[in-house]
Amino acid sequence: MAAVNTVSSLPCSKAGAAVAGGAPRPSTCSVFYPPRCWSKRSSGNGVRAQASTTETTAAPAAEVTTKVEKVSKKQVDGVVTNKYRPKEPYTGRCLLNTRITGDDAPGETWHMVFSTDGEIPYREGQSIGVIPDGIDKNGKPHKLRLYSIASSAIGDFADSKTVSLCVKRLVYTNDKGEIVKGVCSNFLCDLKPGSDVKITGPVGKEMLMPKDPNATIIMLGTGTGIAPFRSFLWKMFFEEHDDYRFNGLAWLFLGVPTSSTLLYREEFERMKEIAPERFRLDFAVSREQTNAAGEKMYIQTRMAEYKDELWELLKKDNTYVYMCGLKGMEKGIDDIMIDLAAKDGIDWLDYKKQLKKSEQWNVEVY
């Protein structure tokens, strides 16, 4: 069973699912997690000694090698992928679609909730595909676009029957001076409650949460890259589960251009009130903030203020880093870590490979 301690401040079209002003209203629902079952498999049943037809001494027995199946540190048990595919998508219904960026924000970002009736058994950190209505310039149906899920596994309404997305409307001017609109993002941002939407998935295991409830989880996000981290944090701080209680440290770094693009800010500040010792929150607002040297405050600039502390955390085997958002953020973060690791005589790029191998460095960028 999972109980929701608080609710989002977002508007909600479902009666009883949320309370205006963010006042908490407990709600319960069943959450099933299959038993954790891992096995070891042998590569063979053994080797018999072979005797030569001309010699009486037996050849030495060959060593028996046993292949041990790797046990993941993440919550992979029972994870479902690709239940719905492009040829046979699930048809959900839009329940809510609301803009969550200010009027002066550089672009629009929308939070939307779709019905699933429990038919899309996703986990925090997974994605779904959306197939927009209509046809392309060649007369063929539009291809699906993948979006990180922005809700916990039980959904914004705590009934395990919805899935939420965080989508930025893509509009830009190409080299010819023509205004181009992203097909799927505009389709989604224009959806009205009651409209149908074709959904595929769920997909992905890269961004699944760690099993260890005492882990340190460092989340690095830019823009709509906040989506999977909202799903993590709702599970950690807004819900109660019989089989999961987060007692570790969650540290979120969120990079955005302006204050009006700080997505879900009220939710995150409420989490800090609930668990001030277990949740740290740092914003990097590039067009409004600078560091001591007068440089623009990008996510890597903010991280540099805590570089020694971050490096010490990264030396521990229960620290997990998750990065989601614009691909350009990777280099800036690597630059910081290269210098830090070098002080200890460590090659950062090699060390990062080890972290990836142990599932402690997880990246989803675009």
Curated annotation (Swiss-Prot):
Keywords: Chloroplast, Disulfide bond, Electron transport, FAD, Flavoprotein, Membrane, NADP, Oxidoreductase, Phosphoprotein, Photosynthesis, Plastid, Thylakoid, Transit peptide, Transport
Reaction equations catalysed: 2 reduced [2Fe-2S]-[ferredoxin] + NADP(+) + H(+) = 2 oxidized [2Fe-2S]-[ferredoxin] + NADPH
Annotated EC: 1.18.1.2
Residues recorded as bearing Phosphoserine in the entry: S185
Protein's membrane topology: Peripheral membrane protein
Enzyme class: oxidoreductase
Cofactor names: FAD
InterPro entries linked to this entry: FAD-bd_FR_type, Flavoprot_Pyr_Nucl_cyt_Rdtase, FNR, FNR_nucleotide-bd, FNR_plant_Cyanobacteria, OxRdtase_FAD/NAD-bd, Riboflavin_synthase-like_b-brl
Annotated localization: Plastid, Chloroplast stroma; Plastid, Chloroplast thylakoid membrane
Location, primary (coarse class): plastid
Pfam families assigned: NAD_binding_1
Residue span(s) of domain FAD-binding FR-type: 87-209
Binding site for FAD: R145, L146, Y147, S148, C166, V167, K168, Y172, V183, C184, S185, T224
Its job: Plays a key role in regulating the relative amounts of cyclic and non-cyclic electron flow to meet the demands of the plant for ATP and reducing power.
Database matches in PANTHER family: PTHR43314
Family per similarity comment: Belongs to the ferredoxin--NADP reductase type 1 family.
Quaternary structure annotation from Swiss-Prot or TrEMBL: Heterodimer with LFNR1. Component of high molecular weight thylakoid LFNRs-containing protein complexes containing LIR1, LFNR1, LFNR2, TIC62 and TROL proteins. Interacts directly with LFNR1 and LFNR2; LIR1 increases the affinity of LFNR1 and LFNR2 for TIC62 and subsequent thylakoid relocalization.
Protein name (Swiss-Prot/TrEMBL): Ferredoxin--NADP reductase, leaf isozyme 2, chloroplastic
Biological source species: Oryza sativa subsp. indica
